[in-house]
């Protein structure tokens, strides 16, 4: 069936979103064109600005349009002395919604995976080590996902913390093994943060 090249292009572009297949992309495209063109324009403008203006925080590596994000630049957060290490910026949103953590973060943008060629420097551990050496950090809370790779990454970081005399703790189990942190409900995540345990070598 022959369709508008622009319509086909729009549907193909929408398929880059997670969980969006051909049918979902088609439904989205027709909805925007048929019922909500102004919403489509707002979406296009927001996407264009986000893609061109959002970068990474110089301290924690999360997404921000500033050099340093609002959390890292907050004096009360700086005085806290705790850093929570997570795998993705989405994990920060999940933890912030619990209201249980008042420190700062460090985003790995992934996890260690030697089979995929992902080493310590690829997930910013050189920057984390620099922060451990230069800043007054009292505790690093390891909130990587409870997967094999996440556990290996947490253990590697715990060893790094030990070299600088910084206490390392792991969030308590309760987060489903093999799950993704951003998908966990707030109550479970609150219990996990409150019941974190120290990692000793």
Swiss-Prot record:
* InterPro entries reported in the protein's UniProt record: DNA_Rcmb_RecR, Rcmb_RecR, Rcmb_RecR_Znf, TOPRIM_dom, TOPRIM_RecR
Query: Which UniProt keywords are given for this protein, alphabetically ordered?
Result: DNA damage, DNA recombination, DNA repair, Metal-binding, Zinc, Zinc-finger
Q: Name one GO biological process term.
A: DNA recombination
Transmembrane segments annotated in the record for this chain: none
Point out which parts of the chain are C4-type zinc fingers, as ranges: 57-72
Protein function: May play a role in DNA repair. It seems to be involved in an RecBC-independent recombinational process of DNA repair. It may act with RecF and RecO.
- Similarity comment: Belongs to the RecR family.
In Swiss-Prot or TrEMBL terms, this protein is called: Recombination protein RecR
| Organism the protein comes from | Escherichia coli O17:K52:H18 (strain UMN026 / ExPEC)
Name the gene.
Answer: recR
């Amino acid at each position: 069936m022959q369709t508008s090249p622009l319509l086909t292009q729009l549907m193909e572009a929408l398929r880059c979103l997670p969980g969006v297949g051909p049918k979902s992309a088609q439904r989205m495209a027709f909805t925007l064109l048929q019922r909500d063109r102004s919403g489509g324009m707002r979406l296009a403008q927001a996407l264009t600005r986000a893609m061109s203006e959002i970068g990474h925080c110089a301290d924690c590596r999360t997404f921000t349009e500033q050099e340093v994000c609002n959390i890292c630049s907050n004096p009360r957060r700086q005085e806290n002395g705790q850093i929570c290490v997570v795998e993705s910026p989405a994990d920060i949103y999940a933890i912030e919604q619990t209201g249980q953590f008042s420190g700062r973060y460090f985003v790995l943008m992934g996890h260690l995976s030697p089979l995929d060629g992902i080493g310590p420097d690829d997930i910013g551990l050189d920057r984390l080590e620099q922060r451990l050496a230069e800043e007054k950090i009292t505790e690093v809370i390891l909130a990587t996902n409870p997967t094999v790779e996440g556990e290996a990454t947490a253990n590697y970081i715990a060893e790094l913390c030990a070299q600088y005399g910084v206490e390392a703790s792991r969030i308590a189990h309760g987060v489903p093994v093999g799950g993704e942190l951003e998908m966990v409900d707030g109550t479970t995540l609150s219990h996990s943060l409150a019941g974190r345990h120290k990692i000793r070598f």
